[in-house]
Amino acid sequence: MVQFLGKQGTAGELIHMVTLDKTGKKSFGICIVRGEVKDSPNTKTTGIFIKGIVPDSPAHLCGRLKVGDRILSLNGKDVRNSTEQAVIDLIKEADFKIELEIQTFDKSDEQQAKSDPRSNGYMQAKNKFNQEQTTNNNASGGQGMGQGQGQGQGMAGMNRQQSMQKRNTTFTASMRQKHSNYADEDDEDTRDMTGRIRTEAGYEIDRASAGNCKLNKQEKDRDKEQEDEFGYTMAKINKRYNMMKDLRRIEVQRDASKPLGLALAGHKDRQKMACFVAGVDPNGALGSVDIKPGDEIVEVNGNVLKNRCHLNASAVFKNVDGDKLVMITSRRKPNDEGMCVKPIKKFPTASDETKFIFDQFPKARTVQVRKEGFLGIMVIYGKHAEVGSGIFISDLREGSNAELAGVKVGDMLLAVNQDVTLESNYDDATGLLKRAEGVVTMILLTLKSEEAIKAEKAAEEKKKEEAKKEEEKPQEPATAEIKPNKKILIELKVEKKPMGVIVCGGKNNHVTTGCVITHVYPEGQVAADKRLKIFDHICDINGTPIHVGSMTTLKVHQLFHTTYEKAVTLTVFRADPPELEKFNVDLMKKAGKELGLSLSPNEIGCTIADLIQGQYPEIDSKLQRGDIITKFNGDALEGLPFQVCYALFKGANGKVSMEVTRPKPTLRTEAPKA
C-alpha cells in the first residue's frame, strides 16, 4: 500500500509515505545504509538511505521505492539523524507493518547520476538487484490528488532548475559493515564466503556452498532432513538460492567406464555467466535422472557453479572425486531463452573399442583402481615371446591401491579406461595414466603361468614367515627397540644417577590400573637413553611387577627415585594410540596469589610436578602429581615455550579453566599372590 502526502522538496525531491506489509513474507526486503548526498559542492544531506531492494519482496512489489531513496521517518519517528543500527532495531520491533516517510529524487537527477563516474555507490547497489525504476506517472486515486496539491511547488522547482546549474546528486554512501545487512533479517549470515572448508563428513566444499548455509533457530527446528556428506538439505538449498525457481537436488552414482553424457552451455548474454544443461545423452550416466536441457546447474558436490563460465564448470566435473555426484539445479521456464545454444538432441553413438581385446586375449581381466594422487605403478615398453611388443607393469608401490586391486609386476597393459594401449609407445601410455582421474579402469593380461604365480605366492608367504620369526627373536635389552603394542624388556644404565621421570599410579591415586610415565626430565638417565617416552606403561622394574592396585602412590614413586648401582631393567608397553582420558577442572585464583601448582614443561603442555600443601588444588584433590595441563583458559599449551605458559598461569585472575590429560592404562600386571 502506498500513500502520497503531496509534498515536493526543492529541485524535484518528492516526499511521500509508503506503508509496507510483510504478512506471508520473510522480510520487508529493504537493505539500508547511512550515507550522504551532495546537493552542491558546499552542501550535503546525510541520513539513512535504501541501499538494496530484494526482488519479489513487499518493498519491490509496491513499486514506489528505489535504491537511493532517503528514509525521513519510520512509524512516525524521525530517523534523519539516527544510526543505521537504531533504524534496524525499529524495523525489527515493528512486527508486520511499517510506515516510511520517503524522500526521493526525480528522474533527471538519476540520469545524471548514471553518467557520473562517482555515483558507483548508487549504481552498483541498483545493478545488484536489477531493479527497474518505476515512474511516478502511474499514481492513481490518492496519488493524483497529491500531485494536484503539489503542482505549484513542482512548477517553482522546475523554474529554479532552469535558472540554476544542474545539480550533481552523487550518492556517496559507504558501508560501515563488511557484509550487507537486511534490516529485518534475524541471524543473518555475515561469515566470510571465500575459500573452502570441510564438512563434518570430511568432504571439502566451497564456503559459499548451500552445504555451508546458516539456518536460524526456527529454520533448524523446521528442517527435519539429515544433512548428506556435502552438508546439503533442501531447506539450506532453498535458503541459499531463494531467488531461483524450482530447485532440485540430483544424485547419481558414477561408473568409471561410462561417460556422464552431459553437454554444457553458457549464457546468451555475454555479460552474464551461467552453466546450463545443453543436452543429456540417454545412454549416459545421467540419462535416467531428472535433468533436462535448459536446467541451470548451480552446484556440484559442494562446488559452486552459479555465476561461473560453463568451461570452468566442465573442468570442475572432471576433477570431482568419488563415485557419487550430487548436483543442485534450477529448472527454467520453457520460454526462457537464457541458454546460448539450442538444446542438443543427438549424441554420437558410443562405441566400446575395448571389446575386441577380450576376443583376442580371453584371459585378460578388468581391474579398477582409485587414483589418489598416484596409481602406484611403473610401466616400461618391452617385448614378450608370446604376445610381442607392448606396455608392461615394471614395478608396484608397496601398499598402493594398484597392489591392493590385484595388479602384478609383469602384467601387460592392454587398455586404460576406453583407450587401447596395444600399439601405444611409452610416452602415449604414461600420458594416458597421468591424465586419468578418479577410478581408473585398466585391462590387464597376466602372462605368467599358474605354476609360476603359485611359486611366487609361496615365496612371499615364506618371506613373511621368516620376517615374523625375526621379529619374535628376543632382543638385547640394552639396545632393544620399543615397538607399539608389545611388551619389551629394556635395560637402562643409571650408574647411581637419578632416572629423571614423573610417574602416575597407586591404590590411593586417580590412576589405579598401571604405572605410566607422564614426564621425562632432560637431565635424567631416561632422557639420555632416548628410548622411553611419556605415556609408556612400566609393567615391572628389575623383575618386580608394578601392581598399583596393591601399592601406594608413595611406594610407586620410590621405585623410580631409588638410586640403582649400575643398571635397571624395565618391562615397557607402549600403547598405540595412547590410553588417555581428558577432563576439565575449574579453579579460582585471587589476584596476587599463586595457583598452588609446581609445573614442568613437556612437548604437549605442562606436567604437574607437585601440589603445594594447603593450597586449593591440593585441598580440592581433583588434580594430582603427574597430570598434564594441555589447555589453559582455552589456549592450547602444546609447543609453547615454558616462559609463555608461566606468563599465562601468572597473569590469570578469577575463574581459571584447565584441560587436563591423564593416563588411563589397561591392566597388564597380575596382583601378587597372597
Curated annotation (Swiss-Prot):
Gene3D superfamilies, A to Z: 2.30.42.10
Amino acid composition bias (Polar residues), ranges on this chain: 159-175
Compartment(s) where it occurs, according to its Swiss-Prot or TrEMBL record: Cell projection, Rhabdomere
Domain PDZ: 17-106, 249-332, 364-448, 489-577, 584-664
InterPro entries given in the database record: PDZ (IPR001478), PDZ_scaffold (IPR051342), PDZ_sf (IPR036034)
Comment text on domains: Second PDZ domain is a type I PDZ domain that tethers type I PDZ ligand inaC by interaction with its C-terminus.
Protein name: Inactivation-no-after-potential D protein
Organism (species): Drosophila melanogaster
The organism's taxonomic lineage, starting at the top: Eukaryota, Metazoa, Ecdysozoa, Arthropoda, Hexapoda
The encoding gene: inaD
